[in-house]
Structure formats: structure tokens, C-alpha cells
């Protein structure tokens, strides 16, 4: 009887309200506009989303974007204690590696040759805010994730990326759009060493997961898409509004729930916040110079630099680091 009663409860009792149709249509359009060669979004196409994020008073958990081919959707909001220009200085400089500013989520990333952002980034970084006219650029990004907090899996994939910098009622707003054109590589086993907040991760080339009874599973990210709006709040801070969809699992099944996506966004933003809000954060130019220096080192020098870290890892015996795959 209890099961029957639960089954006939109105859908509104268990689901968040849908977004207004103009907002959904605008999100759909932006995701379709992400690949290079597509028409640039007109300012009017962005207005429904900007109207919504600046006027919405509902808690993020009470807002639910419609499901898409890329999976279930969530809405999430964060506020960063720094102006948009400073965020852009790190996010839109191709010389700054993603792993330096998103350490909790990105193992490594790179813009592929031919990406518009490789030649356009300077226009964004030096633009007057808000800009007199919208600025648009695109690119194709290669990305590898850090190990998942549950399964230990990490993935690699390509993303179509779209950036639009615009003026909204005298406030600068940056749209960051991503859409995965195909599924990811098969999930490989990694592990988090100690507390995830320490950003210490190890990686193997072994397929599978760290989950009990599911070590054999060959998992994939089947779909991923996002529309993020960064907008100045008028007090020197920047609001970030995330619309995110994801689908992942094995043998074609999807095991991702909205709560998993929200947890992933919180993990992503926690790393970004700690790096960017820290008074000790180096400038984009300093990070780029250090990264270039690392790339110029030979293998022997890199191994020497990493020897203390390797010794630290060798002293760890927590599961699953005692397994052969993590000791090679």
C-alpha cells in the first residue's frame, strides 16, 4: 500500500519546477551553437537566460533544466569574491593550463590546433567591461578528468567550446558553453590519495573501477554539456550560474543522478575558489611561464623534481594504493 501511495503522488511533489520555455530554448540554441563554424549568437538569444539568472529567487535545488540527450540537468549557483576580469585572465588565456586553476576536476587540458580562442583570447582579456559589442570565440578542447570520488575512474574526451562576452544592463557577462560531440574514452582506474581537498591523485592505464563487485566495469561518459553564465554583481564579486547535463555508465546504461552532477559542480568550484581567491595565487603570466618551463624539461629532470612526491606516495598503504596497478 505504501508503494502504491508513493506511486500516485503528483509529479510536482518530487520534481523541481521547469524552466520557462524561452530559457530552455535559449539553452538549446547555445548548445547547438558551440561547434566551430556555427552562426554566432545574437544578443537577443542570450537575454532570456540573463533575465532568469538575475531575477531568480528560488534555491538552486528548486530549479531543474529539462533533460536532454546529454542526460539529466541541474542548475547551480556560486559567487566568487573577485571581479570578472580577474577570472577571465585565467580562464581565457590558452597559455594557462586548466589543471592549474581547476585542480580538483582537471588532470590536464589543451586547446586543439585551429581553435579560434588561440588567436582571439587577447581581445577578451583586454576588452572594456562591459564590452561595447559582444565578443565571440570558439575552440575544441581536449580534457582529462581527475579520478571520480566514488568509482576512481578518470576519462578523456573532446569538448566543443563557445565563449560570449556581452553587456547586460551595464553589467559584463561571460557565457561559457561546452558540449561533448561523442562519448569519452573508456574509464581508467585512478585514485584519490588522502583527502580530496589535498588534490593528490594517482593514475593507471588499467580499465575498470575501484568499486567492490564492479572492478570489471568498462565505463564511459556518454554525454556532457553545460552553459555557465559569469556575471558581475556590482560589488566586485562574480556570480556563476551553471546549467549542466551529464550521462555516464556502462553497457549503455546511465547511472548519473542530478545529485551526482551537483556534487561534481561543487567539487569543481571548490578548487577554482581556493586557487583564485587565495592572496598567494600567482598571476596568469607566472603560471604560464612555470608551465612552459616544465614542458621544456627532459624526462630525467622531471623525475628528479617528482622524486619527493613519489616517495610520499610510496609510503601510502591505503586501499587501493596497495594494489599492483598503483605500484608499477
Located regions from the model:
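Terminal "cap-and-tail" regions of soluble proteins that handle hydrophobic small molecules
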Residues: 15-328
Amino acid at each position: 500500500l505504501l508503494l502504491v501511495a508513493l506511486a500516485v503522488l503528483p509529479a510536482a511533489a518530487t520534481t523541481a519546477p521547469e524552466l520557462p520555455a524561452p530559457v530552455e530554448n535559449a539553452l538549446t540554441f547555445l548548445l547547438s551553437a558551440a561547434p566551430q563554424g556555427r552562426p554566432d549568437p545574437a544578443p537577443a538569444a542570450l537575454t532570456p537566460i540573463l533575465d532568469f539568472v538575475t531575477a531568480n529567487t528560488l534555491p538552486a535545488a528548486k530549479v531543474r533544466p529539462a533533460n536532454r540527450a546529454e542526460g539529466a540537468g541541474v542548475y547551480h549557483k556560486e559567487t566568487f569574491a573577485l571581479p570578472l576580469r580577474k577570472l577571465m585572465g585565467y580562464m581565457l588565456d590558452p597559455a594557462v593550463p586548466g589543471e592549474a586553476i581547476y585542480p580538483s576536476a582537471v588532470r590536464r587540458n589543451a586547446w586543439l590546433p585551429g581553435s579560434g580562442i588561440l588567436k582571439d583570447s587577447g581581445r577578451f582579456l583586454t576588452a572594456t567591461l562591459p564590452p561595447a559589442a559582444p565578443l565571440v570565440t570558439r575552440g575544441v578542447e581536449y580534457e582529462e578528468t581527475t579520478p571520480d570520488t566514488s568509482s576512481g575512474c578518470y576519462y578523456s574526451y573532446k569538448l566543443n567550446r563557445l565563449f560570449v562576452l556581452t553587456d547586460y544592463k551595464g553589467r559584463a557577462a561571460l557565457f561559457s558553453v561546452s558540449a561533448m560531440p561523442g562519448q569519452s574514452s573508456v574509464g581508467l582506474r585512478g585514485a584519490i590519495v588522502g583527502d580530496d581537498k589535498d588534490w593528490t591523485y594517482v593514475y593507471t592505464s588499467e580499465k575498470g573501477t575501484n568499486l567492490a563487485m564492479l572492478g570489471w566495469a568498462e565505463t564511459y561518459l556518454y554525454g556532457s554539456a553545460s552553459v555557465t553564465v559569469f556575471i558581475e554583481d556590482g560589488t566586485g564579486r562574480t556570480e556563476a550560474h551553471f546549467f549542466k547535463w551529464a550521462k555516464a555508465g556502462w553497457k549503455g546504461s546511465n547511472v548519473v543522478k542530478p545529485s551526482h552532477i551537483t556534487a561534481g559542480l561543487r567539487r569543481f568550484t571548490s578548487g577554482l575558489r581556493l586557487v583564485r581567491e587565495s592572496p598567494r595565487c600567482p598571476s596568469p603570466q607566472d603560471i604560464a611561464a612555470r608551465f612552459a618551463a616544465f614542458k621544456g624539461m627532459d624526462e630525467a629532470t622531471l623525475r628528479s623534481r617528482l622524486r619527493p612526491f613519489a616517495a610520499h606516495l610510496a609510503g601510502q598503504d591505503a586501499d587501493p594504493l596497495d594494489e599492483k596497478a598503483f605500484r608499477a
